[in-house]
From Swiss-Prot:
The keyword Cell cycle does not apply. The gene is UXT. GO terms for cellular component: centrosome; chromatin; cytoplasm; cytoskeleton; mediator complex; nucleoplasm; nucleus; protein folding chaperone complex. It holds the Pfam family Prefoldin. This is Protein UXT. InterPro entries: Prefoldin, Prefoldin_subunit_alpha, UXT.
């Protein structure tokens, strides 16, 4: 016995809805999580560079030739140390490379790196907004496909 055309249309609609829901959850939401996680890592890097800038500015203001401090060796294990010359600093360039710079050079590097990281975070924010817009558009399409009405919000009195 053949299925009625209306029932086939309902089944086809149900399959489409399932495919769209799967695409939203498996692809778009996963991509959104990846973009937001990457942006969070960029924010962490930016915060570290800004913290380093503050330390360098304090060093320049203090004008001490020696610096007493504690260094974290890992796992919150700190040791006391003395930095005999504070006129130069080693800065992590990335990919495991470090460069010895004067404090002024380090500040210039930090400014450039901070602006690049800010541009990257802005780009990632824009990407996340595009993905959210795609999710919203697909959800609206699903709503229409399922024949759901968009109920207006009740006015708050």
């Amino acid at each position: 016995m053949a299925t009625p055309p209306k029932r086939r249309a309902v089944e086809a609609t149900g399959e489409k809805v399932l495919r769209y829901e799967t695409f939203i959850s498996d692809v778009l939401q996963r991509d959104l999580r990846k973009v937001l996680d990457h942006r969070d890592k960029v924010y962490e890097q930016l915060a570290k560079y800004l913290q380093l800038r503050n330390v360098i500015e304090r060093l320049q203001e203090a004008k001490h030739s020696e610096l007493y401090m504690q260094v974290d060796l890992g796992c919150n294990f700190f040791v006391d140390t003395v930095v005999p010359d504070t006129s130069r600093i080693y800065v992590a360039l990335g990919y495991g490379f470090f460069l010895e710079l004067t404090l002024a050079e380090a500040l210039k590097f930090i400014d450039r790196k901070s602006s690049l990281l800010t541009e990257l975070s802005n780009s990632l924010t824009k990407d996340s907004m595009n993905i959210k817009a795609h999710i919203h558009m697909l959800l609206e399409g699903l709503r229409e496909l399922q024949g759901l009405q968009n109920f207006p919000e009740k006015p708050h009195h």
